[in-house]
């Protein structure tokens, strides 16, 4: 039997609950994946992540290629043996980090030559090399090598980039040798509907175990972003998981889940925590603010995370203002649990056929009377209007 299967178990409009089977366990979707950039989620142990309901962890091919190196990880048992997380892993292809972090020297048909941000050495990353690195790392879900154009980009560049990404997908697929890893293709096209449609339809032709919506959440307006998400989920196969890359703001998750997205990742909840802010239903609490210094309340009433069950806002504000690392750790723990609770509540609402009510209640608390048009339009397009 194929170690990878995806089955849709419930629907409400275009929102759906699914179950994704991998060699390291089955997970329920929609879900949010914490990002462990260098093989760890900053400040949090695997047992902490398991306790708050994390199901899949993401790590970055680019960073692990630079250090400790893929062959060392392979020799030490792959990610599952090396990093202590026994559940499913997802590795990205390295393409986005090359564009955003590495000092890119050249991009051509062969691949990308970039200068390491660590030591300045020149490194060449091709589709074949990206797949080889991901096979050495041993994640359950791996990504085809792609080019993520910046926003805004000229249409000519977007078109050339998406065609190159499709050719790189074909090379990634040919380079793949491990049957115990599922390769996802990534659709690009920026915010151009015609190019996004073409990229999505051409990517589907490869009949892959899953598909990612790439090239969004890179600075474009929310209206444009969700128009592309709506278009993409309308075109992508119903029986495959859909992954919206780099998206982690709660309101974005609620809108995208309503359109049928299954997987999300982002550094936002942990980075926000390290910078001293907590996610709550009304938005964010900046714990650097003096008004929290005598506030005994938990960050979020009803939250079952260790942070909320143990500490008040006053203590957390003290830690943040004192620069204590524990402050960032406790806020990161809460912020991830906040997103996991959000996706858990979404799954329950979908199973009960009331996703529209769930999303409207979310919007009432998050936005008050000023619900942005893009959010309302996304809900209506998902059948929750």
UniProtKB/Swiss-Prot annotation:
It comes from the Bacteria. Residues 246-252, 270-274 are annotated as: RNA binding. GO terms for cellular component: cytosol. It catalyses: 7-aminomethyl-7-carbaguanine + guanosine(34) in tRNA = 7-aminomethyl-7-carbaguanosine(34) in tRNA + guanine. It holds the Pfam family TGT. SUPFAM superfamilies: tRNA-guanine transglycosylase (SSF51713). Its EC number is 2.4.2.29. Substrate binds at residues 92-96, 146, 188, 215. GO terms for biological process: queuosine biosynthetic process; tRNA-guanine transglycosylation. Its cofactor is Zn(2+). Keywords: Glycosyltransferase, Metal-binding, Queuosine biosynthesis, Transferase, tRNA processing, Zinc. Pathway: tRNA modification; tRNA-queuosine biosynthesis. Binds 1 zinc ion per subunit. PANTHER family: QUEUINE TRNA-RIBOSYLTRANSFERASE CATALYTIC SUBUNIT 1. Homodimer. Within each dimer, one monomer is responsible for RNA recognition and catalysis, while the other monomer binds to the replacement base PreQ1. Belongs to the queuine tRNA-ribosyltransferase family. Catalyzes the base-exchange of a guanine (G) residue with the queuine precursor 7-aminomethyl-7-deazaguanine (PreQ1) at position 34 (anticodon wobble position) in tRNAs with GU(N) anticodons (tRNA-Asp, -Asn, -His and -Tyr). Catalysis occurs through a double-displacement mechanism. The nucleophile active site attacks the C1' of nucleotide 34 to detach the guanine base from the RNA, forming a covalent enzyme-RNA intermediate. The proton acceptor active site deprotonates the incoming PreQ1, allowing a nucleophilic attack on the C1' of the ribose to form the product. NCBIfam families: Q_tRNA_tgt, tgt_general. This is Queuine tRNA-ribosyltransferase. The lineage of its organism: Bacteria, Thermotogati, Deinococcota, Deinococci, Thermales. The gene is tgt.
């Amino acid at each position: 039997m194929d170690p990878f299967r995806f089955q849709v178990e419930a629907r409400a409009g275009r929102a759906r609950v699914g179950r994704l089977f991998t060699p390291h366990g089955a997970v329920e979707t929609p879900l949010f994946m914490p990002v462990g950039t260098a093989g760890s989620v900053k400040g949090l142990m695997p047992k902490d992540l398991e306790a708050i309901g994390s199901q899949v962890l993401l790590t970055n091919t680019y960073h692990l290629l630079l250090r400790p190196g893929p062959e060392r990880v392979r020799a030490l048992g792959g990610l599952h043996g090396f990093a202590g997380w026994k559940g499913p892993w997802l590795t990205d292809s390295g393409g986005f980090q090359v564009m955003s972090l590495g000092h890119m020297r050249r991009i051509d048909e062969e691949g990308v030559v970039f200068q390491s941000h660590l030591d300045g050495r020149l490194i060449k990353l091709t589709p074949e090399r990206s797949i080889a690195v991901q096979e050495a790392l041993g994640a359950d879900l791996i990504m085809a090598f792609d080019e993520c154009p910046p926003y805004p980009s000229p249409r000519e560049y977007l078109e050339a980039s998406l065609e190159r990404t499709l050719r790189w997908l074909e090379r990634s697929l040919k380079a793949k040798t491990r049957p115990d890893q599922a390769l996802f293709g990534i659709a690009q096209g920026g915010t151009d509907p015609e190019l996004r449609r073409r990229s999505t339809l051409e990517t589907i032709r490869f009949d892959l175990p899953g598909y990612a919506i790439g090239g969004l959440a890179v600075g474009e307006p929310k209206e444009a972003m969700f128009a592309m998400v709506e278009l993409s989920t309308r075109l992508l196969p119903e029986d495959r998981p859909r992954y919206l890359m780099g998206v982690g703001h709660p309101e974005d998750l609620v809108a995208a889940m309503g359109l049928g997205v299954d997987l999300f990742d982002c550094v936002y909840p942990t980075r926000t925590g390290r910078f001293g802010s907590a996610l709550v239903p009304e938005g964010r609490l900046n714990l650097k603010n003096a008004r929290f210094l005598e506030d005994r309340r938990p960050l979020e009433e009803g939250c079952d995370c260790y942070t909320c069950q143990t500490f008040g806002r006053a203590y957390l504000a003290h830690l943040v203002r004192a620069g204590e690392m524990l402050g960032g750790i406790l806020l990161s723990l809460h912020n991830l649990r906040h997103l996991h609770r959000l996706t858990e509540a979404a799954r329950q609402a979908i199973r009960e056929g009331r996703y529209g009510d769930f999303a409207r209640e979310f919007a009432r608390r998050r936005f008050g009377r000023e619900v942005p048009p893009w959010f309302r339009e996304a809900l209506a397009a998902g059948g929750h209007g």
